[in-house]
Amino acid sequence: APALGFVPIAVHFDLFGCLQEIGKPATAQDVCISITFLHKKSMFAKVNRSSDDTLFLMGGLGFLDLLPDDVYQANAVTRFLVDTPSAQHGAMHFTSEGLLASAFLMRRLMDTKFEYPFQECDTPFQYAHKLMGNEHLAREHVYSVMHETGRLDSFNTFMTGKFGRWGTMPDRVRKLGYDLDGLLQSTAPERIRVVDIGGGRGELLLEMQATYPHLLKKENLILQEYNADIGVVPEVTEMGWNYKEDASEQPVKGALLYSMAHVLHNLSDIESIKLLTKVARVMAPSSRLLIQEFTKNAASSTTHAAMILMHAGRERTSAEWRDLAAFAGLEITFEAYPPNGECVVEM
């Protein structure tokens, strides 16, 4: 675990990219020189002092190959990290915010006489900031903390890749037996509205638009995000909605499809029910709510732990989804749980 603390250094200085750019076995000095050419010369002195240890530890983690005489070489994992920037930023997130929360888990449990489960904004992540004297950050949500500490843009880059592992969203749900084609094609084009709640930079909507260009135009695709660093997504209709505010109701009524992908696992059961209830109140009889999260099993156990430690959230089983649906006045009409990747739950 201590070696994981060096991952943010490797990502910050682009050590993986520089090693791959060299294209042959290289010393830490070679990598540092490469950084001065690929980035800026002022970085050389900063990275030179820690590069050898960082490269060695990344080799120990399997992210690159360790060769004799303190020589390093890119391997398949290195190439994956370079070719998939979201993976590097994901690694940075889990070894920054995630590792911080993990380090303070037992301390918080002991200090609170093992109070569990955690509640939103009262997790080991906030407790870490409290004990470090950051009283303001200790009261903030992890996203607000990342915004204030300059980490949110990196996190958004990580989330850009959350849909890119096993094909596009339409391909993935088709393979699981969900009839997205039938749902869209059986509806008059002027009545089609797809609302992606917490949709980041709009990747899911853009994948749907690319698959159904004859059906989905900008006015059909509504991106709802409450995130200060998202920026403009010109191909979709952007709309702010802070569902956390008690008086803030879902502004789009009667949409054909409401989507939540990797949103509810960030929320406790109580907060999830609040959000689901707000959507349920505006759904028409023909409306569908489509949820995509990781299937809760051994493969997603690390993500499950991260959600608990930072968000008081969790991955969920079929029985847990059914309980949430019932509390929100909804009914599950389709569900599929692959052994790897994202499950699909329709309400």
UniProtKB/Swiss-Prot annotation:
Domain of life assignment: Eukaryota
Keyword annotations of the record: Methyltransferase, S-adenosyl-L-methionine, Transferase
Pfam families tied to this protein: Methyltransf_2
Enzyme superclass (EC): transferase
Binding site for S-adenosyl-L-methionine: 166
One Gene Ontology term from the biological process aspect of the record: secondary metabolite biosynthetic process
EC number(s) reported in the record: 2.1.1.-
Pathway: Secondary metabolite biosynthesis
Active site (UniProt): 265 (proton acceptor)
MF annotations from Gene Ontology: O-methyltransferase activity
InterPro entries: COMT-like, O_MeTrfase_dom, SAM-dependent_MTases_sf
Task performed by this protein: O-methyltransferase; part of the gene cluster that mediates the biosynthesis of aurasperone B, a dimeric gamma-naphthopyrone. The first step in the biosynthesis of aurasperone B is the production of gamma-naphthopyrone precursor YWA1 by the non-reducing polyketide synthase albA, via condensation of one acetyl-CoA starter unit with 6 malonyl-CoA units.
Family statement drawn from the similarity comment of this UniProt entry: Belongs to the class I-like SAM-binding methyltransferase superfamily. Cation-independent O-methyltransferase family.
Name recorded for this polypeptide: O-methyltransferase aunE
